[in-house]
């Protein structure tokens, strides 16, 4: 996605070999037009996958997931990173390790928003080691539903996540694939 590549190069900051800061358009301030375009790309790639719902993990995946769901005319479900009292314990949960924050959290899904006939598209902002996407897939499959695909805004291709998910049979589609990060340098996969 050329417009995303351009924004990453113009506004993104490689803070280290593993950390890319894109808070000016994706995960602090959000550019709605760019999110809409992302939704179009995800819709076009996954439109023949017979998807019934779009899932994401709070919070930075919400904007691209909403735009994708809107364009596919489907509901969007947010997987919670902490348990909520209003969920009343009728949930699926799995432990996920956050690469960015270096901590574990309980990914939570209310049982009333999934059934065994669902074919789910998971949308997330970043893919590094694949723990978040794999955790989402575990919840979906625990409910008896299927993972139709995994859409990623920015994939860190130099980390193991994308290959690990593909090796497990998931259809992973990334809008931007980063080959290398170093202080001040961002290189895309050719």
Swiss-Prot record:
GO terms for cellular component: cytoplasm. GO terms for molecular function: xanthine phosphoribosyltransferase activity. It catalyses: XMP + diphosphate = xanthine + 5-phospho-alpha-D-ribose 1-diphosphate. Xanthine binds at residues 20, 27, 156. Pathway: Purine metabolism; XMP biosynthesis via salvage pathway; XMP from xanthine: step 1/1. Disulfide bonds: none annotated. 5-phospho-alpha-D-ribose 1-diphosphate binds at residues 128-132. Pfam families: Pribosyltran. Converts the preformed base xanthine, a product of nucleic acid breakdown, to xanthosine 5'-monophosphate (XMP), so it can be reused for RNA or DNA synthesis. Homodimer. NCBIfam families: PRK09219.1, XPRTase. PANTHER family: HYPOXANTHINE/GUANINE PHOSPHORIBOSYLTRANSFERASE (PTHR43864), XANTHINE PHOSPHORIBOSYLTRANSFERASE (PTHR43864:SF1). Belongs to the purine/pyrimidine phosphoribosyltransferase family. Xpt subfamily. This is Xanthine phosphoribosyltransferase. It comes from Clostridium beijerinckii (strain ATCC 51743 / NCIMB 8052) (Clostridium acetobutylicum). The lineage of its organism: Bacteria, Bacillati, Bacillota, Clostridia, Eubacteriales.
